Amino acid sequence: MTTSRKKTRNLREHVSVGHGRFGKHRKLPGSRGNAGVGMRYFHKLRNKFYCQIVNLDKLWSMVLGKGFLPENKPVVVKAKLVSNTDEKKIKEAGSAVVLTFLLY
């Protein structure tokens, strides 16, 4: 094809030469090593500052009724706080619950 019939000759004096004003015809970052890694790192940081609220006084001292106790070994559980389900399970297993309070 001769040069005079090529598309580039027809697009002379057109501002963006058929590649659009907004998107622009830019070189691809994919062939440039680690170029474009920034957005991947940005998505990693999305929940960087998210932190659930936890009551520190209940963190180590709250007993929840999620597990199970051995039936033949009685246990004495000492804690500041005990849930209703856990207290019920402990007493059914023949164990005891002792509520203790710490003064700060």
Curated annotation (Swiss-Prot):
<keyword id="KW-0687">Ribonucleoprotein</keyword>
<dbReference type="GO" id="GO:0022625">
    <property type="term" value="C:cytosolic large ribosomal subunit"/>
</dbReference>
<keyword id="KW-0689">Ribosomal protein</keyword>
<dbReference type="InterPro" id="IPR036227">
    <property type="entry name" value="Ribosomal_uL15/eL18_sf"/>
</dbReference>
<dbReference type="GO" id="GO:0003735">
    <property type="term" value="F:structural constituent of ribosome"/>
</dbReference>
<protein>
    <recommendedName>
        <fullName>Large ribosomal subunit protein uL15z</fullName>
    </recommendedName>
</protein>
<comment type="similarity">
    <text>Belongs to the universal ribosomal protein uL15 family.</text>
</comment>
